[in-house]
Amino acid sequence: KEEFLPELDFKLTETDLINMLLEEINNGMDGTDICPGVIKCGTSYNNITETEVKIIKAAAKVHTLTGIPVSTHCDKGTMMLEQGELLVKNGVKPENILLGHTDVQKDLNIQLEALKRGFNILTDHVGRELDNIDEDRIRKIEIMIREGFGGQVFLSGDMGKKDYVTAYGGRPGLDYILGV
């Protein structure tokens, strides 16, 4: 998502981004020996900017060189089909793509279309009752399973803020999914 990108991402070429990612994959991130197991990219709300296209193409190229799967950020559940198709056009097989935040998309038909195209989708706002509530998520997942897509639906709690961690007085807590 462009608004959260570091300034460097706007300046680097696609080739520079590819080389930077390969360096981290082969030698570790931030001076450590910890190597990534997934490549992340994303898009803005209802839009894919030129910089985001450059990053998605770089992520796709790195995937084709390494086999590391690609996980995406679909801002408020938008642009999932476009992200997936851009990755496929640049060499990523649909089964190696995990489209994130798809449960925020209110139109179940868009989620089903992503699944029909072979993409994996991430229901990761579980416990975060923003625009959708968990009962709606469960209902949609039941439909996806009945349609034969159960193996392509992933559950997660996108709980990256203190507001969601019980140790800081937040809710629902990191163990929420395990308890429901």
What does each model-found stretch correspond to?
Residues 99-105, 124-142:
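Active-site glycine- and acidic-residue-rich loops that bind
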Residues 24-34, 61-64, 88-91, 111-118, ...:
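Acidic (Asp/Glu)-rich catalytic clusters
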Residues 124-125, 149-170:
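Short acidic/histidine-rich active-site segments
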Residues 53-58, 134-142, 170, 174-176:
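Charged helix-capping and loop-helix junction motifs
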Residues 36-38, 67-71, 96-98, 118-122, ...:
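Structural preference for beta-strand elements that scaffold enzyme active sites
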Residues 1, 44, 75-77, 102-105, ...:
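Active-site beta-loop-alpha junctions enriched in small/polar residues
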Residues 1-64, 120, 125-130:
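Active-site gating/metal-coordination segments in enzymes
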Residues 50-53, 78-91, 108-116:
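Distinct, well-ordered alpha-helical segments
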